[in-house]
């Protein structure tokens, strides 16, 4: 991830002020579902993040209940929604907002993210905001403020209303209405 991404992060505001304890490990997550990516992507992402951050990390893997997850990874079993395929599995990212699976600050990366330099600056961002990379399809359109969900930083306890909103709707209706998870996130957490 290059330094320009730092300038392309959008923030979405809430009412509490919070920072990560500098002495605590950073909680980092990824999601692997179905056969779109093999396990080597998890290992590579873990390696990249570990090399490019100075804090110790806890690495969380959100995946199917029956998928084995070796140490040192922390497994979170996803609810099986029966969705599969390379363009549908991204809907499982909505479960990252379920604070019953993990509660607290969480830095999320898609499995195909490449981290190339130090990312310590991310954990210093104020957690009263929801932080995500700006949607790269619209980088040259300054009026567009939508996010790309490939890199996100937030406190799951403060944004669990996203999960509750997803649960309150019919999943098939959501999938048919929105192009992908980030469109729904953009609607539920409007840019401040």
Task: Briefly describe each language-model feature range.
Residues 118-120, 142-143, 147-149, 162-167:
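A short secondary-structure junction signal
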Residues 24, 55, 93, 109, ...:
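Residues that flank catalytic or metal-binding motifs in active/ligand-binding sites
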Residues 44, 48, 52, 96, ...:
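Amphipathic alpha-helical segments that form well-ordered structural scaffolds
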Residues 59, 97, 112, 152, ...:
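A residue-level signal for conserved active-site and pocket-lining positions in enzyme catalytic cores
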Residues 67-70, 75-81, 92-144, 154:
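GT-A fold catalytic core of metal-dependent nucleotide-sugar glycosyltransferases
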Residues 156-192:
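Catalytic core and acceptor-binding pocket of nucleotide-sugar-dependent glycosyltransferases
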């Amino acid at each position: 991830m290059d330094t320009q991404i730092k300038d392309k992060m959008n923030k979405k505001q809430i009412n509490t002020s919070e920072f990560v304890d500098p002495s605590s490990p950073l909680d980092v997550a990824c999601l692997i579902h179905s056969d779109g990516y093999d396990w080597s992507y998890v290992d590579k992402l873990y390696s990249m993040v570990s090399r490019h951050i100075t804090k110790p990390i806890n690495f969380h893997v959100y995946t199917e209940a029956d998928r084995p997850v070796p140490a040192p990874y922390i497994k979170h079993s996803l609810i099986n929604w029966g969705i599969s395929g390379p363009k549908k599995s991204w809907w499982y990212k909505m479960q990252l907002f379920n604070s019953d699976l993990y509660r607290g600050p969480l830095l999320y990366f898609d499995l195909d993210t490449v981290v190339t330099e130090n990312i310590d600056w991310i954990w210093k961002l104020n957690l009263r905001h929801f932080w995500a990379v700006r949607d790269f399809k619209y980088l040259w359109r300054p009026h567009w403020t939508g996010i790309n969900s490939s890199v996100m930083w937030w406190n799951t306890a403060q944004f669990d209303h996203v999960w509750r909103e997803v649960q309150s709707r019919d999943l098939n209706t959501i999938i048919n209405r929105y192009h992908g998870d980030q469109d729904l996130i953009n609607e539920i957490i409007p840019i401040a």
